[in-house]
Amino acid sequence: MVPVVGADSAGVRHSPAVVMVCHNYGCAKQAAVRVDTSTLWWIDDVLQASADAAAEREALSRVLAQLYRLAARQSPVGNDRAGNFLDDGVEGRMDCIDHATTSTRWLALLEARGMLRFHRVLEPARRTRFILQHFSAVVEVLAQEPAADAPALEPAMLAAAEHGAARYDVAPEHAQAPATVAGERFAIDAWFVDHGEPAVVLPLDEWLKGGGPNVH
């Protein structure tokens, strides 16, 4: 994550940043891509509209697509296609190492700017099947604090809420479990898609077992 320049050390949420984007397989080449203020404002608006962790992951999928499109205006990565075979030998092609590394850098920038409310960014994950290995960026769901102005819960409701089973305005017998829970991890994998398309988001356990589109 070191090759992120301007990661908001001064606390300026939307100041321009430079992210090193890997390409040509195995991060053989890197291009310095400038993320401008208007793009960061747009990203912030998209992410802050997310009401929960699931919505934030869907937003991150779209945000990564936009960042890769931005990178294509400053580097040859617009030539990248899903998997490895469709763009073999093409300048700007990206394998899973390029995508996992670059996506993690994009996500780390957003995290450093305080734009992620429901997730934290982890190191890339690796899966191995037979003699092949594959990498992806990963995020983890954060524990959520109750709103400051939320009414106090009755003891029974509080106990249920601690296990994600109830809210103060829902009777315990009708409460639904949240779509995701704190500590759950998800792969955000842009290698599966053509350049500029939303990244594939999968539970990490499913991804580790070989989940995802059938591309090569």
Language model features by range: what are they?
Residues 108-205:
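Hydrophobic/aromatic-rich core segments of domains that either
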Residues 59-119:
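Mid-length scaffold segments of soluble, non-membrane domains
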Residues 22-54, 80-89:
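Acidic/histidine-rich, surface-exposed loop or edge segments in extracytoplasmic proteins
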Residues 51-54, 58, 71, 75-78, ...:
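Hydrophobic alpha-helical membrane segments
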Residues 200-216:
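Low-complexity, Gly/Ser/Thr/Pro-rich intrinsically disordered linker/tail segments
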Residues 1-16:
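Bacterial Sec signal peptide processing site at the extreme N-terminus
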Residues 16-25, 54-65:
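Short, mixed-charge, low-aromatic patches
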